[in-house]
Amino acid sequence: YFVDTQDFPTTGDFVMIRYVDDGDSLILTTLPRRTYFSRREPGPIPRDQAVAANFDYVFIMQSLNMDFNPKRLERYLTLAWQSGATPVILLTKADLVEDYWDYLMEVDRVATGVNTHVVSAQTGYGLNHLNRYLQPGNTVVFLGSSGVGKSSLVNALAGAV
């Protein structure tokens, strides 16, 4: 940083730089964030530390198996709304259940009005419904517990599966 009065940029930040011919360009400032996720920075003085910025949608992922947890979904929805972005709920691993109607009813109870999609990265089921969010100029953050299929979904959307 040129001036030491700002936090370092985070994923998604836009910055102003001063280009230097030797390749060691300087960040002059971080531009204002439209949306962001933060966490409490560890240490004796609690303060927020941004972990992602300037995204349009938060894909909140819960798998249709033993991982499904309405209380966790509520917490993730709160984080998404606080970020300033639009939450979208993805119920993953549709290939592992015969009937997902009860899950959809529970999601509707917890998150009335939030767009919800049932998907499977393995079979491709429901992925076409995500195209409306994945348009040029849109940025998406994936939020979910370990094992819900975040990496598998990214790979499927990128055509690697």
Which residue ranges define each predicted feature?
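Histidine-anchored nucleotide/phosphate-binding helix
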Residues: K71-Q82
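Canonical P-loop GTPase G-domain recognition
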Residues: T86, K93-V148
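Conserved G1/Walker A P-loop phosphate-binding module
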Residues: F2-D21, I27-T30, Y125-V161
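Short, flexible, glycine/charge-rich loop motifs used to bind or transfer phosphoryl groups or to couple energy/partner
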Residues: T5, R47-Q49, T78, E106-V107, ...
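Structural beta-sheet core signal
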Residues: I60, I89-L91
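N-terminal accessory targeting/assembly segments
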Residues: Y1-P70
